[in-house]
Amino acid sequence: MKLIKSTITALGLLFTVTACAGNKESKNQNMKGENMEIVHLTKAEFLKKVYNYEANPNDWKYEGDKPAIVDFYATWCGPCKALAPVLEELAKEYAGKVYIYKIDVDKEEELAGAFGIRSIPTLLWIPQSGKPTVTQGAVSYTHLRA
């Protein structure tokens, strides 16, 4: 009887671990397989791909070749977590047309400070030419598309 109970428990545990690991793997494949362009940036990458504020502190000069959205977020932030799937949908819809970048404010404190990020999520909307605009708080897919 103990052997049967132990076997059932072991199989249940194995099934649970396998199911959880399988979900994580398919999520990563989904992000790569659908050409989603959500890129997590460090300060060095931001300076190269978006705006080198150290070299040009007074003049905005976008370094990219197409418009971009920069999401300043934190992993513990509820509204940031709610915004993540919305940005993934935008990345699918506008793949190849818009860069979508994410910056973890806890890992990149200096970068967040340089932009005066006080509330998260904060979205920095960067047009191909002209000055960027800012949106704060979680917003819906419909609002982001407008």
What annotation goes with each model-predicted range?
Residues 77, 142-146:
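Conserved small/polar residues in nucleotide/adenosyl-binding loops
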Residues 121-134:
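A short, hydrophobic beta-strand/beta-hairpin element that forms part of a small beta-sheet core
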Residues 72, 91, 96-109:
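Thiol-based oxidoreductase modules, predominantly thioredoxin-like and allied folds used
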Residues 42-66:
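A short beta-strand-turn-helix
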Residues 109, 115-124:
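Structural micro-motif
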Residues 65-66, 72-76, 119:
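Short pre-active-site segment immediately N-terminal to redox-active cysteine/selenocysteine motifs
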Residues 2-47:
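N-terminal targeting signals for export/organelle localization
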Residues 81-93:
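Typically the conserved alpha-helix immediately C-terminal to a functionally engaged Cys/Sec
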